[in-house]
UniProtKB/Swiss-Prot annotation:
One GO CC term, this protein: virion component
Protein name: Core protein VP3
Keyword annotations of the record: Virion
SUPFAM superfamilies referenced in this protein's UniProt entry, alphabetically: Reovirus inner layer core protein p3 (SSF56831)
Family statement drawn from the similarity comment of this UniProt entry: Belongs to the orbivirus VP3 family.
Record-linked Pfam families: Orbi_VP3 (PF01700)
Locations listed in the record: Virion
Organism listed in the record: Epizootic hemorrhagic disease virus 2 (strain Australia)
GO MF term set: structural molecule activity
Function: The VP3 protein is one of the five proteins (with VP1, VP4, VP6 and VP7) which form the inner capsid of the virus.
Record bears the keyword Transcription regulation: no
Amino acid sequence: MAEPPDAATPKTSPYLKGDELSSDSGPLLSIFALQEIMQKVRQAKSEYMAATKDVDLTIPDVQKIIDGVKELASETIYKVVNKPLISYRHIVMQSRDRFLRVDTYYERMSEVGDKIDENEPAKFYETVIKKVRHLRTEGAFVLHNIPTRDHRGMEIADPEILGVDVKSILPVLTAEHRAMVQHILDGAIIENGIVATRDVDVYFGACSESVYRIYNRLQGYIEAVQLEELRAAITWLERLGRRKRMTFSQEFLTDFRRADTIWVLALQLPANPRVIWQVPRCSIANLIMNIATCLPTGEYVSPNPRIASITLTQRITTTGPFAILTGSTPTAQQLDDVRKIYLALMFPGQIVLDLKIDPGERMDPAVRMVAGVVGHLMFTAGPRFTNITQNMARQLDIALADFLLYMYNTRIQVQYGPTGEPLDFRIGRGQYDCNAFRTNFQTGAGYNGWGLVDVENREPAPYDHVQRFIRYCNIDSRELIHPATFGIGMNYYCYNEMLRMLVAAGKDTEAAFFRNMLPFHMVRFARINQIINEDLHSAFSMPDDQFNVLLANMIAGAQERMDPVVLDISWISIWYAFNRSFEPTRRNEMLESAPLIESVYASELTVMKIDMQQMALLQRRFPDVLIEARPTHFWKAVMEVSPEPVRAIMDLAHSHSFINIRDMMRWIGLPSMQPSMKLVLEEEAWAVANDFEELMLTDQVYMFRDMLPEPRLDDIERFRQEGFYYTNMLDGPPTIDRVVQYTYEVARLQANMGQLRAALRRIMDEEGWVRFGGVLRTVRVKFFDSRPPEEILQALPFDYQTSEKGGLTYATIKYANDTTIYYLIYNVEYSNLPDSLVLINPTYVMTKVFINKRIVERVRVGQALAVMNKRFIAYKGKMRIMDITQALKVGTKLAAPTV
């Protein structure tokens, strides 16, 4: 981040920045909170991080991350095109009626991904996930405004949209064959159909089976209309609007329900909060996202200064602790502590305060005593949640006792108890028992939760996981708050008891001050209640089941997945926080889009979980290629291809450096999902990828000595007409009795004995086949019209190297190398001699591959268009395809069309 222009200018008073705290927004406070939390992380982990790897703990830009997530919501995972991909192309040979038909999907898929190495399982995982994403991307298209032509009064499909490229073969066909092809093309009639009361074009074309499955799944998703999901989302948004006191407009509904509109809903509301909260080490990241997306912008308002002037400082000479601090000015660090206090009040239980170890302040009796009094009125310590730690509660008890006892005379009688604990005494003529103010987390005694119900369940909340309503000081957040009148005549148990105790101790001036501060104090907590129960209510809010056990676990010292964040504050900052109230001035700018941000985040997390579940199965399916694989490998592979904003949110507190295998496997096994279009297509892509040959990966690679054909050219015309070619692709696997299975153990044993080459040579001489393990290999497809390079012809299905070092011979053998399926097309001229293709020494090829897919076929002219058997649905040009996902916002008015 660049420094401000005046960064180099010396400041005469570098700490007096009180006015800078006047306005805090949600994103600003989220960055501040993240800075403070990361400071605690640094301190807590500094001891053992010195002995482990270095971790970058820089503070990320939360606003930039959220903007990235919003951009994800605006992206469409499908393409709107006017013609499908060319799925089949033809390679012309010298024959006039025979050609090679190539499935271009397998050609493109063979070029995706890197070379697989059995010693680097991370590369294998990355290759698989890249191929799956490539498949999903190719099949996710919607046809719109397809080109057509008129033929004898009928609408005929343009050849470009049929998915078969016949342009390359037309020049070499006879007139009879060209007429036959043209007749077939003229028969590609466009039919009229109806999808969800919308008129569409229907025609038959060609498409690779894998791509068509993705396309068909996407089309089924669109044809299902998602009407119930949309109604549920609108109903839920209206509920959320009532909870957050925002208006949800339905004006856009009249826009996309017109008869000329096809609308698509890619996400669903509400987001499943379990998906968000089951991510490993997610508590801090979700807390920061809750602050950034929901916390309103506000100002820190001070009370009327006359309250102090007519009570604490009414005399010319004022030497009491409160009077001394009344005119003090906070420093920048102390104002930061005020921010921490209000963050802790807005996130009870999640953020807990503790006192800094500051010998200078601890020795200042005035600061400690004042903080001890106002701390009991600012914080809650049980019975349902707490804002402070046990240590801080005890220190505040001691400070309160010191204030009550620092100056008393014979008129103020004090009777000490037997235990010697803080506040174990009776004071005043009425002998007020100060033991009642000693901290008791089971009853909330001595603090704001004392004698009242500060957590309640009312009407069902929009988010199922957060049904609690916070009631600080027994204030109902639904009440209308007017600062001029609210709080007058109101009270609650702890405040009343504090006034009674102060009067009993002879602190009449301080009691008068607190009595006059009560309306200001009630307005403060009324605002906080509203912020917690309305603005901060989101999927990033901590679930009730985890919130309810925070206090009990803290008291018992039990460690759970969701532990509170402890922030340190100074003694005097408690006084400054008491004299300032957070007054919201405007709602968070991202409040209306927060539900969409949550849904996008949950959807991406679900897709990542599906990917990791499928990756976890690979090691069991193909152990030979994943001998050294660990769960961290597929975790990193999926993270590598996931959107950057989602990775940034998950790693907002740099927790990925400390996630272990147990965290990963536990998350992968949890069943919670967030439905979305991306999830539907991802699941279908993995269903296709269960057959790994669809990803151009195979374990059916054999070593077999075969002679490259060298035919005699006795009849050149017939040879050309046959369309002669050679390939190392097998039509079927060899018979099992002729195949020798070479596992890693067998190969290493023979290599260590120095007999591997000899053993393989003996098998080749006996015309046997060798299969090297069950390792998956990447398969490439190449075509040649002349002799292929020697490195392809002589390639072996394994890598074997020997080296000598220190008098010892070392052998290295690897199976997972790239395999090439090649097609050699023989071209001859009429001037060639009969033995033009014959060599003195034959050429041997050693690698054979079997894939149970029709990648290349030799077909006749009549079969060239026989693959047009897939039904396509295309939306008419005058129809609008509208993605209404962006309309799922509180307060939105219009859905923007994508076409």
